[in-house]
Amino acid sequence: MEKYENLGLVGEGSYGMVVKCRNKDTGRIVAIKKFLESDDDKMVKKIAMREIKLLKQLRHENLVNLLEVCKKKKRWYLVFEFVDHTILDDLELFPNGLDYQVVQKYLFQIINGIGFCHSHNIIHRDIKPENILVSQSGVVKLCDFGFARTLAAPGEVYTDYVATRWYRAPELLVGDVKYGKAVDVWAIGCLVTEMFMGEPLFPGDSDIDQLYHIMMCLGNLIPRHQELFYKNPVFAGVRLPEIKEREPLERRYPKLSEVVIDLAKKCLHIDPDKRPFCSELLHHDFFQMDGFAERFSQELQLKVQKDARNISLSKKSQNRKKEKEKDDSLGEERKTLVVQDTNADPKIKDCKLFKIKGSKIDGEKAEKGNRASNASCLHDSRTSHIKIVPSTSLKDCSNVSVDHTRNPGVAIPPLMHNLSAVAPGINSGMGTATLPIQSYRVDEKTKKCSIPFVKPNRHSPSGIYNINVTTLVSSEKSLFRASKKRREYSRTDVHLPELNYNHLPELRALEGTARNSRLTKKESKILSESRIPSLAAIDLHTPSITLHQVSGPPLSDDSGADLPQMEHQH
């Protein structure tokens, strides 16, 4: 029963209660009848088992549909389709009675449903307005089969029968234990006048008072019932009332038509053996006039189909609602994850972004790289102001499909942005800024913050990299302008850090050639002072220039900035 959500109490009786519930899985609204603890009360258990047994074998458009049966903690639970409207509700809304056409449709379906039960040798025994449900489409459904039972075999007697007094047949009131389908027909006769007039036909306060109302309208009981009355110990010392003047139905309800009075009289015949069967009632003139029975039978089928569609649409609507709620919850979870990711450590976040972007096509990476290259950052310090020009990634440069001759703007790999490495990394003989190169995969997460000092304008003889001389000159001027003192140092004392060309074999070979050239010149001439040449005068239009050719006589600096001198202790 955990799959049902309680929506409120519908009704309560001496044997249990009925609650309105919603199925959490399908969203269908149901009515659950919860009996009292049946293991402690044999009567409750008997009523529950009887209703379960009968409703399992009764399936009809005018009978309430039993959906499920379960037992939990000594209690029986019966799950029915939910119909929240009854004929009693109509009578309370219209105390002066219902319209003729409405009563005609209701009675046709009531008799049809009871006739189906009788055809299966089952009598309801508790027909009354509150036990007759009406759906939104106008389909009538009989409910509450707690007092229903199969017909007794010959010689068998009925026991434990307690029904609503106002609708009890005379044979039930006097205690006859051999009754049959006629008790339901009597109840139908009581409903006929009540639905038309809005008031109960025989509103007795007790069993003897009920007999009095019946005898006032219909006359004396049959001899057999009178005998049973005087033998019944319940009526010991009580005599049947003497009726001096009767009040028949036509006098009591003069506004009712003759056909309605005739239908009621047939159902309310004082002798149960003379009451008609339900099949005979359906052929009464009340239903056959103007072809109502045939016409309404077709209309009833459409109403039943409409109710079935409404149930199906309700299920689909609930399923769509659940799917939407599920999608909304997933969306909220995604939003939560995004918020958590933005609050995470920047390095971890960038790493995650890198993994995601790595699976995309090269065109997207190139587009993002171009957008990133349009940004610039400004590094401020006490001694220098350097404008950093972002570069594209090494991965883009290492692409062999790139024509470096036609695309001189291809960027060099990202460089470390430790400015202290600039001074020892400048070679007067090489004319290049050599900084330790880190792994591309490590620097990828910080490539947006890389600080390249040079921008390629022409590729080197190796066909891989080129240095933008103009950018280097402006950087040199900014660095040298900050220094005020000149210090002397020997060219032999200058030790350049070795580049780690793990993934650039051609540059490593080029570095060896440059070293040999520098050692040869060292033997012939020792310079006591060395200036880092300005590259402003180098012919930028000579594509065959090599790195060792950059070394030579110092070029004059247009700005007149002095070179910094450093003392090296060994």
From Swiss-Prot:
One of its GO terms (cellular component) is nucleoplasm. Residues 311-334, 548-570 are annotated as: Disordered. A motif ([NKR]KIAxRE) lies at residues 45-51. This is Cyclin-dependent kinase-like 2. The gene is CDKL2. The [NKR]KIAxRE motif seems to be a cyclin-binding region. SMART domains: S_TKc. GO terms for molecular function: ATP binding; cyclin-dependent protein serine/threonine kinase activity; protein serine kinase activity. Keywords: ATP-binding, Cytoplasm, Kinase, Nucleotide-binding, Nucleus, Serine/threonine-protein kinase, Transferase. InterPro entries: CDK, Kinase-like_dom_sf, Prot_kinase_dom, Protein_kinase_ATP_BS, Ser/Thr_kinase_AS. Belongs to the protein kinase superfamily. CMGC Ser/Thr protein kinase family. CDC2/CDKX subfamily. Its EC number is 2.7.11.22. The active site is at 126 (proton acceptor). The keyword Kinase applies. It is found in: Cytoplasm; Nucleus.
